[in-house]
Amino acid sequence: HSVYVDQWDWEKVIRREDRTLDTLKRTAQEIVDCICDVSVRLNREYSSIHTRLCREMSAITAQELEDMYPDIPGGSQRENKYLEQHKTALIMQIGGKLRSGKPHDGRAPDYDDWALNGDILFWCDWLGCAMEVSSMGIRVDPAALDRQLTLSHHDERRDLPYHKALLNGELPLTIGGGIGQSRISMLLLGKAHIGEVQASIWDDETVSACEKAGVTLL
């Protein structure tokens, strides 16, 4: 991110029977399909754009990823290893501690259900690493919020208006997420730095490094 963060946030009301990993994966695939559709159209209309994205999304849990790469210590490093082969993936169930005793990545306890959330990532050949474009998930219901507040040692939030209403079952069940606008632009245009698609403020070190790499900052 730069100092300016731009993203689309969305939220959709669902039924209790929709609080499943299948719903999560199906929704994530719809987002991937939309991004890939735009990429195909851009490549067709602009001869200078040659980005190729993989529409086939692989879904894997954070625990499965740790089991697959036990010698790789960090979540982002395991993501890169996996995405290098699978190109497009949904990394699911982020927030709780894995069997190693460490979480894959941090997540707020009062947002997504840690058992029903995920990150959408694409592999970027021009960067040699994975890029996360969306963090999403089925939101906490009363049981999940109760559990996650205790696990994260944030029981003091229970008396806040939002938390109290949710714990009392007064709010609808939803799925939602955020989609990084500038990250999508970088992905579709094959750009190496967020400053190529977004006008912002950069320190001298970043400006110098980009000049040496031939990266034009807006």
Show where each model-derived region lies.
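Inter-helical turn/loop segments and adjacent helix faces that build the functional surface
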Residues: 14-22
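Alpha-helix initiation and N-capping motif
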Residues: 7, 21, 28, 159-160, ...
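Residues forming anionic-ligand binding surfaces in small-molecule and nucleic-acid pockets
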Residues: 1-15, 163-164
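Alpha-helical scaffold segments that mediate packing/assembly in large oligomeric complexes
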Residues: 36-74
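Noncatalytic linker/hinge segments flanking ATPase motor cores
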Residues: 27-33, 48-57, 215-218
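Compact, glycine/acidic-enriched structural inserts
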Residues: 23-42
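A translation/RNA-centric and nucleic-acid-associated enzymatic feature enriched
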Residues: 62-218
